[in-house]
UniProtKB/Swiss-Prot annotation:
This is UvrABC system protein B. Residues 639-674 form the UVR domain. PANTHER family: UVRABC SYSTEM PROTEIN B. It is found in: Cytoplasm. It comes from Prochlorococcus marinus (strain MIT 9211). GO terms for cellular component: cytoplasm; excinuclease repair complex. Keywords: ATP-binding, Cytoplasm, DNA damage, DNA excision, DNA repair, Excision nuclease, Helicase, Hydrolase, Nucleotide-binding, SOS response. One of its GO terms (biological process) is nucleotide-excision repair. The UvrABC repair system catalyzes the recognition and processing of DNA lesions. A damage recognition complex composed of 2 UvrA and 2 UvrB subunits scans DNA for abnormalities. Upon binding of the UvrA(2)B(2) complex to a putative damaged site, the DNA wraps around one UvrB monomer. DNA wrap is dependent on ATP binding by UvrB and probably causes local melting of the DNA helix, facilitating insertion of UvrB beta-hairpin between the DNA strands. Then UvrB probes one DNA strand for the presence of a lesion. The beta-hairpin motif is involved in DNA binding.
């Protein structure tokens, strides 16, 4: 049996041993909810890693965004190099859901772009859950969406055992039914080929090939081989080849599903005709009958997920099976930054249903399409038997359900104290801010600035840039992978200041940041609530000289609470340091590029040639034209960038995405202006 082996040069320090002991005891005693109330930089991830090792449970770590999930996955992979630490997020690089706008009679078809590498990591996660117990899956909130039927996925796997006889034709037929594609020329993930007595398969969950060597019908050898060099990497006694897609429907169930779809179609057509909705009836009949024919002929159709209830044999209103259902009964849930993540669960379901209702009412989809949905909040929590919430500022609900299971962790192993907090008036704040930034730049330290609006962030970034400050603006339109690159660039000193709105709060591990600035700190609201302020102040808590500067003309209740909590923690930390003779020292984390290497982006960009250029160049141009000099876009590259952007603009127009096309047009105009003003 596989066991967890925690790899760390450090032993638990400060109040980590007490927190670990209490959480492990709670899990072993069967407590349903516990909360780790840990200040920023106190090593909450290390504490949880110890809890996972000591309890030995398969664990789902839930994060509220892809960036944080990637960071957590990196840290846990370093702690558990010999165990299965998997990454499970949405595999869409781009996703436009199907929608209908009745006011303008506009139908928007679903369009998406799947990231093959992330799809591979998702398959790797489910494979690990079937084959071992020492599994940690770090997932975003997308894990609450339907993911096939675990039992059918497992049943459909094709097993090869050394020395066994196989029916080669039947094995090939099974691979095809599991949505593998035969390709005797180019073997890659999701493909297979057979030449003589050698069968090679590109599993959906591996970047290695599986080679099955036969002697007649007998399996003579099973090997992992390098897809490029053909080098033998590992010899195996047996292997399961899992389906290339998570949604697997056996033929007998497919026939039953088609009959069920036809019955629902008849009922809905009768309803529309009775209501006098002849256009809706005609639209629904035409679309659904076409989908049924596709299902009969090839077992698949566009938008097949809308028939998920029929294909899985579920009753109306019952929850879909998702990643959670791939875990064994005694799994453990860890919710990171729980004050944000928990509230997301309900929002996901509500947003999905409002869009689906419009499609159903206007005859674009059958009513059963509404059951292709994420889990409701109560459905999710009914599946989670034991949960540990992690947050520096847990929400009211987490505290309420963890009545006898709240564990506080305030002491940092490095001895670093919470930041000093100072409130200054807004008069002359920009000049004062510029002075503070220059002090940090001289010492090669970094600065985070949070504003209330996007416009304020843009204007401030422009002003700082004009004053020769190396600054970058982080905004919501930047893709999650590029966000990781931006944060990485801040750490290594490509620029000194990062400006944002609400993207600078949770889970950003930035030991180089010594100053956090909060503008308009007295403007009450979500972005200036007590939890948001505590989280933002905490971004400077990893630096020995951490300092939080709040510009405000009034002291609000939220500000007062945040300052008092920071001072309370600081006092506890100072007392502990004095008692044990600890001198604060900076965190030893290197600004490595491990997140990016984990996602294998560099390899992907190198291999994709022109497409990679399009991604890497145009993403910079589209997202940050006003700062193109800071991004290293050379003047000689501008014509090529403009050409590629025009291609993207035309593509967006062809897909009727006129809003995106207009944005690209405006950005092309800006680039042309830059082109007309040579350096």
């Amino acid at each position: 049996m596989h066991k967890y082996h925690l790899n760390s040069p450090y032993l638990p320090k400060g109040d980590q041993p007490k927190a670990i002991s209490e959480l492990v005891y709670g899990v072993n005693q069967g407590k349903q909810y516990q909360t780790l109330l840990g200040a920023t930089g106190t090593g909450k991830t290390f504490t949880i890693a110890n809890v996972i090792e000591q309890t030995g449970r398969p664990t789902l770590v839930l994060a509220h965004n892809k960036t944080l999930a990637a960071q957590l996955c990196n840290e846990l992979r370093e702690f558990f190099p010999k165990n299965a630490v998997e990454y499970f997020i949405s595999y869409y690089d781009y996703y436009q859901p199907e929608a209908y706008v009745p006011v303008s009679d506009t139908y928007i078809a679903k369009t998406s772009s799947v990231n093959e590498e992330i799809d591979m990591l998702r398959h790797s996660a489910t494979r690990s859950l079937f084959e071992r117990r020492d599994v940690i899956v770090v997932a975003s909130i997308s894990c609450i969406y339907g993911l096939g039927i675990p039992s059918e996925y497992l049943k459909a796997s094709v097993k090869f055992q050394l020395g066994n006889d196989i029916n080669v034709r039947e094995s090939l037929r099974e691979l095809v039914s599991n949505q593998y594609v035969r390709n005797d020329v180019d073997i890659s993930r999701g493909n297979f080929r057979i030449k003589g007595d050698v069968l090679e398969i590109g599993p959906a969950y591996e970047d290695r090939l599986v080679r099955i060597e036969l002697f007649g019908d007998e399996v003579e050898a099973i090997r992992y081989v390098d897809p490029i060099t053909g080098e033998i990497l590992e010899n195996l006694n047996s292997i399961n080849i899992y389906p290339a897609k998570h949604f697997v429907t056996p033929k007998d169930r497919l026939l039953i599903a088609i009959q069920s779809i036809q019955k629902e179609l008849k009922d809905q057509l009768d309803f529309f005709n009775q209501e006098g909705k002849l256009l809706e009836a005609q639209r629904l009949e035409q679309r659904t009958k076409y989908d049924i024919e596709m299902l009969k002929e090839v077992g698949y159709c566009n938008g097949v997920e809308n028939y998920a209830r029929h294909l899985s044999g579920r009753d109306q209103g019952t929850p879909p099976e998702c990643l959670i259902d791939y875990f064994p009964e005694d799994w453990l849930l860890v919710v990171d930054e729980s004050h944000v993540t928990c509230s997301q669960l309900q929002a996901m379901y509500n947003g999905d249903q409002s869009r689906k209702k419009v499609l159903i009412d206007h005859g674009f989809r059958l009513p059963s399409a509404a059951d292709n949905r994420p889990l409701k909040s109560d459905e999710f929590w009914s599946k989670a038997k034991q949960t540990v919430f992690i947050s520096a500022t847990p929400g009211d609900w987490e505290c309420e359900v963890s009545t006898d299971g709240i564990v506080e962790q305030v002491i940092r192993p490095t001895g670093v104290l919470d930041p000093v907090v100072e409130v200054r008036p807004t008069a002359g704040q920009i000049d004062d801010l510029l002075d503070e930034i220059r002090k940090r730049v001289i010492k090669k330290e970094r600065v985070l600035i949070t504003t209330l609006t996007k416009r304020m962030a843009e204007d401030l970034s422009d002003y700082l840039s004009e004053n020769r400050v190396k600054v970058r603006y982080l905004h919501s339109e930047i893709h999650s992978i590029e966000r990781i690159e931006i944060i990485q660039d801040l750490r290594v000193g490509e620029y000194d200041v990062l400006v944002g709105v609400n993207l600078l709060r949770e889970g950003l591990d930035l030991p180089e940041v010594s100053l956090v600035v909060i503008l308009d700190a007295d403007k009450e609201g979500f972005l200036r609530a007590k939890r948001s302020l505590i989280q933002t102040i905490g971004r400077a808590a990893r630096h020995v000289d951490g300092f939080a500067l709040l510009y405000a003309d009034n002291l609000t209740e939220s500000m007062s609470t945040a300052i008092q909590e920071t001072e309370r923690r600081r006092a506890i930390q100072q007392a502990y340091n004095q008692k044990h003779g600890i001198i604060p020292k900076p965190a030893g984390k290197k600004p490595s590029n491990s997140i990016l290497s984990f996602l294998e982006l560099s390899r992907k960009l190198q291999n994709e040639g022109d497409n990679a250029d399009l991604v890497s160049i145009t993403s910079k141009a589209v997202d940050s034209l006003n700062q193109s000099e800071d991004l290293g876009i050379a003047f000689v590259e501008l014509p090529e960038i403009i050409d590629k952007l025009e291609g993207k603009m035309n593509l967006a127009a062809e897909e009727l995405d006129f809003e995106q096309a207009a944005k690209l047009r405006d950005r092309i105009r800006q680039l042309r202006k830059k082109l007309s003003k040579p350096e």
